[in-house]
């Protein structure tokens, strides 16, 4: 026996999670529904590897000798740096560039998979998580961006989220660029200050207009006494930015009119507003008014995107860790990224896409009761009473017959006795067990114990009359009638579940 001190400690790395069967089934059920919508729109699946050359990812390269800030990186045997992908978009850009001549343009694809971030983990922040993306590469017109928004709205509704409980919010990088240019922040030399402005606007939901005003100016002192330095804009520039964030109107037409007034005279800003107007016309024509909204307060990701940017937000309340009611918030986002594929091609390649945070959307659906996998039926367990080779073969035949009939089934392969086997079947959520001892075998029979009915009877039946009138929890049938008898039990249980769910 190994010394206790030599035992390896079983421990999960920080920032990672194990996924149990219910979570896996729930995720697959949700993603299958999303795939149905994306397929309906004519998008095709594609899969890229988890590992890419680090320079193909492009975003995180602070140190060429050790480029693992933000990503998990390693060197291969020819000393080239490789990294685990941090999103699904950069690998898609590489794939499209590498196969550009053979792919149809526009190229419409979707993919789901794990992504990795080499960042400090915390509550709700993991180093490995799943995304589900859809992208169109090679479409310069904003009709492709509008389609992304409409497809996301349809996916949320197909998942059971009602109208009024979600909104796809849309903005345009060019509009904000027009505002920033108008206040003197044009050009790469002002990149840091532009980013500070974006970060300030992103706090609008959290701090309100006055909080954003402070962050655009000298800075903001919070309740704990911490001071956040502001963007140091002059008062006139602050008013211009706040006018942009407050441009949202009663409907899309009013919002667009307000934005036109804010960027009047700036060509880039006016181009962005026109793109929003074109998208709004498509939303109206498709019947998506109220579901997809033009919203100037959307700034998340604007430093990355080159045109329209969109965010899927769930509007219902949930209780946070402090017991407070809060709006659930974002479950995905995207936008136009015309520069990403162009890095490989040396020529303009327009692209737009949308990414769903799978775990976050799963949490939302569970809160709404829209992702119930409790109807998953465990396997029928054939108990093993005699372990000699000949009788094991008989048990194996029973299992095979059940499986051929499309019934989940397993033969107990442990080494324990009858009591432990019954406990095992209960922990496996088995709907019933099959028992054949020597007496049943000689008679050519099997016993089938309905575990679901047995639990119900033991909890509910108080007198012998009721017991006799109930469906019996254990029956004996001919061996050749096993499959039919098990199917009858499973069908009865399914009817009971359906009745209880009404």
Curated annotation (Swiss-Prot):
SUPFAM superfamilies, alphabetized: Class II aaRS ABD-related, Class II aaRS and biotin synthetases
Catalyzed chemical reaction(s): tRNA(His) + L-histidine + ATP = L-histidyl-tRNA(His) + AMP + diphosphate + H(+)
Highest taxon listed in the record's lineage: Bacteria
EC number per UniProt: 6.1.1.21
Pfam families given in the database record: HGTP_anticodon, tRNA-synt_His
Entry keywords, A to Z: Aminoacyl-tRNA synthetase, ATP-binding, Cytoplasm, Ligase, Nucleotide-binding, Protein biosynthesis
A GO BP entry: histidyl-tRNA aminoacylation
Cellular localization per UniProt: Cytoplasm
PROSITE patterns: AA_TRNA_LIGASE_II
Transmembrane spans: none
GO cellular component, one term: cytoplasm
One annotated GO molecular function: histidine-tRNA ligase activity
Subunit structure: Homodimer.
UniProt family annotation: Belongs to the class-II aminoacyl-tRNA synthetase family.
PANTHER family referenced in this protein's UniProt entry, alphabetically: HISTIDINE--TRNA LIGASE (PTHR11476:SF7), HISTIDYL-TRNA SYNTHETASE (PTHR11476)
HAMAP family: His_tRNA_synth
Protein name listed in UniProt: Histidine--tRNA ligase
Organism: Brucella ovis (strain ATCC 25840 / 63/290 / NCTC 10512)
Gene designation: hisS
């Amino acid at each position: 026996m190994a010394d206790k001190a030599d035992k390896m400690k079983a421990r999960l790395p920080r920032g990672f999670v194990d996924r149990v069967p219910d979570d896996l089934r729930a995720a697959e059920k949700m993603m299958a529904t999303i795939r149905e919508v994306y397929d309906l729109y004519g998008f095709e699946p594609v899969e890229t590897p988890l590992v890419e050359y680090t320079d193909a990812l492009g975003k995180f390269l602070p140190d060429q000798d050790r480029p693992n800030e933000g990503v998990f990186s390693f060197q291969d045997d020819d000393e080239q740096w490789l990294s685990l992908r941090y999103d699904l978009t950069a690998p898609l850009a590489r794939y499209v560039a590498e196969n550009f001549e053979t792919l149809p343009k526009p190229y419409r694809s979707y993919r789901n998979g794990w992504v990795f971030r080499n960042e400090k983990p915390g509550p709700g922040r993991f180093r490995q998580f799943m995304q589900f993306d859809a992208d169109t590469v090679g479409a310069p017109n904003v009709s492709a961006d509008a389609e992304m928004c409409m497809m996301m709205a349809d996916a949320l509704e197909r998942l059971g989220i009602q109208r009024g409980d979600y909104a796809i919010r849309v903005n345009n990088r060019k509009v904000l660029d027009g505002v920033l240019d108008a206040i003197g922040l044009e050009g790469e030399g002002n990149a840091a200050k532009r980013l500070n402005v974006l970060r300030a606007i992103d706090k609008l939901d959290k701090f309100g207009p006055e909080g954003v005003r402070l962050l655009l100016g000298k800075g903001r002192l919070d309740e704990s006494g911490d001071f956040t330095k502001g963007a140091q804009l002059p008062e006139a520039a602050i008013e211009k930015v706040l006018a942009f964030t407050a441009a949202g109107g009663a409907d899309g037409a009013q919002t667009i009119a307000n934005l036109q007034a804010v960027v009047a005279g700036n060509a880039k800003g006016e181009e962005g507003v026109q793109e929003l107007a074109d998208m709004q016309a498509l939303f109206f024509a498709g019947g998506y008014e109220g579901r997809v909204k033009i919203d100037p307060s959307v700034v998340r990701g604007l430093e990355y995107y080159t045109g329209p940017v969109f965010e899927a937000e769930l509007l219902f309340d949930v209780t946070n860790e402090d017991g407070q009611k809060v709006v659930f918030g974002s479950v995905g986002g995207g936008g136009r990224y015309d520069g990403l594929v162009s890095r490989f091609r040396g020529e303009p390649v327009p692209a737009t896409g949308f990414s769903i945070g799978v775990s976050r959307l799963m949490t939302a659906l569970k809160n709404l009761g829209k992702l119930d996998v409790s109807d998953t039926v465990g396997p029928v367990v054939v108990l093993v009473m005699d372990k000699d080779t000949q009788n094991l073969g008989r048990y194996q035949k029973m299992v095979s017959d059940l499986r051929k009939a499309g019934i989940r089934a397993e033969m107990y392969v442990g080494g324990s006795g009858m009591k432990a086997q019954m406990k095992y079947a209960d922990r496996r959520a088995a709907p019933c067990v099959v028992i054949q001892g020597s007496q049943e075998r000689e008679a050519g029979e099997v016993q089938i114990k309905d575990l679901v009915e047995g639990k119900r009877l033991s909890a509910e039946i108080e007198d012998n009359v009721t017991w006799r009138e109930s469906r019996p929890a254990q029956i004996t049938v001919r061996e050749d009638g096993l499959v039919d008898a098990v199917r009858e039990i499973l069908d009865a249980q399914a009817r009971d579940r359906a009745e209880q769910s009404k």
